[in-house]
């Protein structure tokens, strides 16, 4: 994906379900955005996107589906964020071009483990573009693009149908994930 594929994601409040009409297991994400010293960063921006429960991004879905599993959320005064989406599943990178040919020549598979993408930013701090990978996802140890780091793998706790963390009645099992982000101060610009 390139930046033009991501532009225009809606600004939504904390607690929003980003996965309305998206296939996949419901998942509640929460955590904080902190500085290196552990100070919460209020009003930090999380630009979030993921595929559906079958590994398809909205631009890969048939028809005009609009933006799905995407949104921009700001942290609260304590640096907290929370939203609902889906538990990401593994998927293949395109194999019909040079990357596919390279992977084939190397004897490597084209799969990425399940992950959700985020660009996390705050005024005065270096932005970070990253993923949260689902612990236990297939291909964690052999990601086609070598993007997995242990620090980016999060536990997805499974819960039976019942009351979700937002008070919503869930008629299917759901997951919860807690993950904190740390941002470095921006480098000062030389005069």
Question: How would you label these PLM feature ranges?
Answer:
Residues 4-191:
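Beta-strand-dominated extracellular/periplasmic modules and repeats
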């Amino acid at each position: 994906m390139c930046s033009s594929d991501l532009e225009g994601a809606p600004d939504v409040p904390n607690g929003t379900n980003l996965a309305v009409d998206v296939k996949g297991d419901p998942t509640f994400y929460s955590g904080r955005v902190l500085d290196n010293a552990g100070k919460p960063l209020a009003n930090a921006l999380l630009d979030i996107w993921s595929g559906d429960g079958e590994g398809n991004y909205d631009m890969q879905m048939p028809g005009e589906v609009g933006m799905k599993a995407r949104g921009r959320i700001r942290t609260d005064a304590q640096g907290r964020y929370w939203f609902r989406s889906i538990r990401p599943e593994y998927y293949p990178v395109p194999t019909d071009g040079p990357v596919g040919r390279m992977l084939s020549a190397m004897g490597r598979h084209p799969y990425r483990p399940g992950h959700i993408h985020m660009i996390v930013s705050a005024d005065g701090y270096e932005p970070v573009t990253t993923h949260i990978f689902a612990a236990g996802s297939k291909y964690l140890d052999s990601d086609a693009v070598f993007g997995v780091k242990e620090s980016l793998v999060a536990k997805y706790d499974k819960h039976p149908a019942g009351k979700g963390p937002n008070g919503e009645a869930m008629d299917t099992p759901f997951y919860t994930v807690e993950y904190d982000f740390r941002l470095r101060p921006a480098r000062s610009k030389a005069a």
